[in-house]
Amino acid sequence: MTKKLKILSVISTICMIPLLLGGALVTKTGSADGCGNSWPLCEGQFLPTKISFEMFIELSHRGVTGVVGILIVYLTYLVWKELRHNKEVVFLAFSALSLMILQALIGAAAVVWGQSDFALATHFGISLVCFAAVFLLMLQLFEIDKKLHTEDIHINKTHRIEIYAISFYTMCVVYSGALVRHTDSNLACRDWPLCVNNSSFGISDYNFYQWVQMGHRLAAGILFIWTVILTIRMVKHYKNSKVFYWSWLITLGLITLQVLFGALIIFTSLNLAIALFHALFITCYFGMLSFFMHLSFRAKRREKYSNQS
């Protein structure tokens, strides 16, 4: 049964990727109203006879959401049936299920009643946390037989706090990026890294969309520098742990690609493939940070038990 759970968790994690990218695609292509204000039906029909491009994108996103939802429900059921004694696994499974339901309801509410750009930006953030929960559940299932060799990693208190802080800050950066999409501020600034490279900052002349765009760039730049500094420190301090060592190097690579593809969005005038890769890299990056948070929680718990004994 453990093997079945592992396979199902891998499939669920992989399927979360097109779910997240599908949501970004809906926004990028302006397909949010592809089915009108009808949900779960499309234009009041199960399968409309005339399907436009926008309708196809929206229907595909709903279909993927439904499939992933069924996978997570089944995975949660099996976890409860077979591993209810493992509190970490049960918590992650029910967290993933709850977040999946929440993000689906927010998506449905956006279709039926409409939502502000700020509320819609939250939709992607919740989906990202849901992905992190499924990803961690998969890792936890593989850790049952100690194949990842993470049980002996001790993360000191200072580094744990830094991991929590950068993870929380990443969510803020993700929210600002989602706000860029939902307010159509992607090309509010035609240059990079400044809004207009051949002039002074001129921030007093920025309109709302330029403030949103440049605010996101500033936040992303800080995140990149922070990740570089933290990676150097973690690699030096935990070089004896191969999993931790390589995980941080992968994380640094992901944030580097994230910044690169963010710039390419401007240079290619919002090329769709580039924009989707931009969403993919931040998803994987946050997944890695979630892994570090998981290890930090575990290290704190071991430290607490050690002090008590």
Swiss-Prot record:
Disulfide bridge partners, by residue number: 35-42, 189-195
Location(s) in or outside the cell: Cell membrane
Residues binding heme b: 216, 278
Cofactor: heme b
E.C. number(s) listed in UniProt: 1.17.99.9
Source organism superkingdom: Bacteria
Pathway(s) the chain acts in: Porphyrin-containing compound metabolism; heme A biosynthesis; heme A from heme O: step 1/1
Membrane spanning residue stretches: 7-27, 63-83, 89-109, 124-144, 160-180, 212-232, 248-268, 272-292
Membrane topology (Cytoplasmic): 1-6, 84-88, 145-159, 233-247, 293-309
Active-site residues, Swiss-Prot/TrEMBL: 58
Pfam family, one: COX15-CtaA
GO cellular component: plasma membrane
Keyword Protease included in the entry's annotation: no
GO biological process annotation, one example: heme A biosynthetic process
Role description: Catalyzes the conversion of heme O to heme A by two successive hydroxylations of the methyl group at C8. The first hydroxylation forms heme I, the second hydroxylation results in an unstable dihydroxymethyl group, which spontaneously dehydrates, resulting in the formyl group of heme A.
Family to which this protein belongs: Belongs to the COX15/CtaA family. Type 1 subfamily.
Name this polypeptide is given: Heme A synthase
Record organism: Oceanobacillus iheyensis (strain DSM 14371 / CIP 107618 / JCM 11309 / KCTC 3954 / HTE831)
